[in-house]
Design a protein with these regions (language model features):
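Non-catalytic accessory regions flanking glycosidase/transglycosidase catalytic cores in CAZymes
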Residues: 1-259, 268, 304-482
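Long, well-ordered, tryptophan-enriched scaffold segments
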Residues: 256-270, 275-284
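Short, flexible helix-coil linker/hinge segments at the edges of structured domains or between repeats
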Residues: 218-231, 275-295
């Protein structure tokens, strides 16, 4: 079966047909649920600011029948108010950059670019113990019980901890180690589990490729020397993390992780950007193969066979069988270009065929952008919530066409998504059904570089399905069988 939770987003879902929403990002690392205050770290001058109210986030999701994934800080400090900032120029002197709207808030770098050593975390923050987070999760669970409807499906253990010493260096200047990650995971996950035994716990929400294999301490030294990893049997950090949590589960009877959660962004030159030149667009589409294809060597500094989803599932199977796998953040860039839409459609299709459990697009595709229509192709292709179905069907396609097929429980209703990944040539698609079924009716919806929406080609009766797929196009076939 295809998981319904691979169609997630972080922001407002509108009519995209998204099924689940994530509360995350750098600001979530320092969110104080009592003060409704947060701090985006180096993203914005290490300034505290008013947060988005988590209660509204959850209430909105409940009203829309969406599940929620909410990030719980485990860094140990959260914003104490909505006004303080980490590197006042009045205290530290002139800095490389400053907030144009709050002139005393600096960026923590001297004019020559060297880093200023931070003051105590109390400059901006208060301690946030596991018990403080237990109180928050308890408040969430009690509110949902009161409302009589559950929205929170998973609690995510912070956000990209291997980057704390850069993104949040004013409160966590030292690079994260293997042992600190495990210690914080156990202490905070235990508190979450005690407060809401029904909730699923996801972690470690790491940023990308390097952080799957090395700790922040390793990368701060060098991955060649990798002192932290060598001190832990030279085992890559994610498999080590899973194995240690499995050991903890077996020794205590307390399961602290349900979902292996990582983030993934393509690293090829210009891919995760608005760039839409022909070369970058082609690379963007090829880069989606890193999600699944064992033969694809990533065309970036990674220069390795990523095969992300099979790799993560294999690590789980070996080190902590039974866990689900989530991409807590991902995007292939170029939201306003057809190549970005095709890459997103390719990703959504592969999530289904590869058996991914959860995925959350970062952030939300702009209304009527190609990425928006890629979501609509899978989740609301007719504007009336018709969608890709929940059982995957094996397909075979040649050339520059990707074909994803789904069926309902009866087997009499099929929805196909066909992508022509060639920018200049149309493709002939003769769709043949292996077996005894014949087509009663079919309807085609298509979107290409010249479209403003998915265009309905009209209901057609019977016969074969021979169609032309425009260059760089997303095509949905809604088929009823006899």
């Amino acid at each position: 079966a295809i998981s319904p939770y691979i169609y997630g987003m972080a922001g407002e879902v509108e009519d995209t047909g998204a099924t689940t929403r994530r509360w995350g990002g750098n600001r979530s690392t320092r969110y104080n649920w009592q003060a409704n205050a947060t701090n985006a770290g180096k993203d914005w001058y290490f300034e505290n600011a008013k947060g988005d109210d988590y209660r509204k986030f959850l209430a909105d999701n409940r009203a829309r029948h969406l599940t929620s994934a909410i990030t719980i800080p485990i860094i140990g400090w959260v914003a104490k108010d909505s006004t303080s900032f980490g590197f006042p120029i009045s205290v530290y002197g002139p800095q490389h950059g400053k907030d144009p709207y709050r002139g005393d808030a600096g960026d923590g770098q001297r004019p020559d670019g060297s880093l200023i050593k931070p003051n105590a975390p109390t400059q901006t923050s208060v301690e946030a113990s596991p018990d403080f987070m237990k109180q928050w999760v308890t408040a969430i669970a009690q509110q949902e019980q009161k409302d009589g409807a559950r929205s929170v499906q998973q609690y995510i253990l912070d956000n990209e901890p291997a980057l704390w010493n850069t993104n949040h260096r004013d409160i966590h200047p030292d690079p994260l180690t293997y042992d600190e990650l495990l210690d914080r995971t156990i202490r905070y996950a235990s508190a979450i589990r005690a407060a809401d035994p029904q909730g699923l716990i996801a972690g470690p929400a790491e940023w990308g490729w390097t952080a799957y294999f090395y700790s922040a301490k390793d990368t701060a030294t060098s991955v060649t020397l990798r002192p932290d990893r060598r001190a832990h049997g030279d085992t890559p950090i994610l498999p080590w993390y899973l194995a240690k949590l499995k050991e903890h589960d077996q020794s205590t009877g307390s399961k602290l992780l349900d979902i292996l959660d990582v983030h993934f962004y393509p690293q090829g030159q210009g891919v995760y950007s608005p760039n839409s030149d022909a070369e970058t667009a082609a690379l963007r589409l090829r880069s989606t193969r890193a999600l699944w294809d064992p033969s694809y060597k990533d065309e970036s500094w990674i220069n390795d066979n990523v095969q992300l989803i099979p790799r993560l599932k294999a690590w789980v199977a070996k080190n902590y069988p039974g866990l689900a796998v989530s991409l807590g953040e991902y995007s292939f860039g170029a939201e306003q270009h057809i190549s970005g839409g095709l890459a997103e459609a390719e990703a959504l299709g592969r999530f289904g065929t590869e058996g991914l459990d959860y995925a959350y697009y970062w952030f939300v595709p702009p209304k009527n952008s190609p990425v928006y229509w890629a979501f609509r192709a899978f989740r609301n292709f007719d504007g009336k919530n018709a969608h890709f179905l929940d059982r995957s069907v094996d397909t075979h396609m040649d050339g520059d066409v990707s074909l994803f097929a789904s069926r309902d429980e009866s087997g009499k209703h099929l929805v196909l998504v066909a992508l022509n990944l060639n920018p200049t040539s149309a493709a002939k698609a003769s769709i043949v059904l292996n077996g005894c079924a014949t087509i009663a009716s079919h309807e085609k919806y298509s979107y290409d570089a010249h479209s403003t929406s998915l265009v309905d080609d009209g209901l057609k009766s019977g016969g074969t399905l021979d169609e032309t797929l425009a260059p760089y196009s997303i095509n949905v076939f809604d088929i009823v069988l006899k």
